[in-house]
C-alpha cells in the first residue's frame, strides 16, 4: 500500500486522484453552464502546458544543472504552464488549483512528520546521492517547495487535460440531433 522507495509508487497516493478530480470539477462546471463553447483551443492550451512541463523537466534533468538553476527554470516553466492551463479554462484551473493546495498542504505536513520521525517511507526517503545539508534545507528542497509550488501545476495541467475531453464528449452527447448537424 505504501513504499519506502524515493517517490514510492504506492496504492495510497494523492497523484492518482488528480484525473478523477479533473473530471469531477469539469463535469460540475459543465452542468453549471461554465464550460468553454468549443474545446479544441482549450485542449491545445492544456496539451501545450503539459508538453512545456515535460520538456522543461527533460532539459533540467539531462543538463546536470545546479539546484538553483533548476529551481529557477522550474518556477518559470511552472508559471507559464499554469498560465496556459488558465487560458484553456479559467474556472476549472482555479478549482483544480484550490484542490491542489487542499491536497498537498497535508502531504507536506505528513512529509515533515515522516522526515522528523524517520518513518522509513517514501515521505522521508532521499536519493542515495542526496547531500547532507541538514533537516530544514532538505525539507524545503524535497517537500515544501515541490508540494507547495510544483505539484499544483501538475494538478491543474493534468486535471484540465483529462477534464476537458470528458466535458467535450458530454457536450456532444447533450446536443440534439439537429444541433449536431448544424
Predicted segments with their positions:
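Central hydrophobic cores of alpha-helical transmembrane segments
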Residues: 95-106
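Alpha-helical transmembrane segments and their immediate interhelical/interface regions
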Residues: 1-15, 49-92
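Hydrophobic alpha-helical transmembrane segments
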Residues: 135-161
Amino acid at each position: 500500500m505504501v513504499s519506502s522507495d524515493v517517490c514510492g509508487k504506492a496504492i495510497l497516493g494523492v497523484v492518482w486522484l488528480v484525473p478523477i478530480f479533473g473530471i469531477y470539477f469539469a463535469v460540475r462546471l459543465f452542468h453549471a453552464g461554465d464550460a468553454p463553447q468549443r474545446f479544441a483551443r482549450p485542449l491545445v492550451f492544456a496539451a501545450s502546458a503539459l508538453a512545456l512541463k515535460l520538456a522543461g523537466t527533460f532539459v533540467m534533468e539531462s543538463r546536470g544543472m545546479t539546484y538553483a538553476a533548476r529551481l529557477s527554470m522550474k518556477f518559470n516553466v511552472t508559471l507559464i504552464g499554469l498560465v496556459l492551463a488558465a487560458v484553456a479554462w479559467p474556472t476549472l484551473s482555479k478549482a483544480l488549483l484550490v484542490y491542489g493546495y487542499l491536497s498537498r498542504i497535508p502531504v507536506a505536513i505528513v512529509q515533515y512528520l515522516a522526515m522528523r520521525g524517520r518513518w522509513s517511507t517514501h515521505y522521508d526517503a532521499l536519493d542515495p546521492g542526496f547531500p547532507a545539508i541538514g533537516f530544514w534545507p532538505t525539507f524545503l528542497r524535497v517537500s515544501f517547495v515541490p508540494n507547495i509550488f510544483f505539484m499544483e501545476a501538475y494538478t491543474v495541467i493534468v486535471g484540465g487535460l483529462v477534464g476537458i475531453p470528458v466535458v467535450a464528449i458530454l457536450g456532444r452527447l447533450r446536443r440534439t440531433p439537429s444541433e449536431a448537424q448544424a
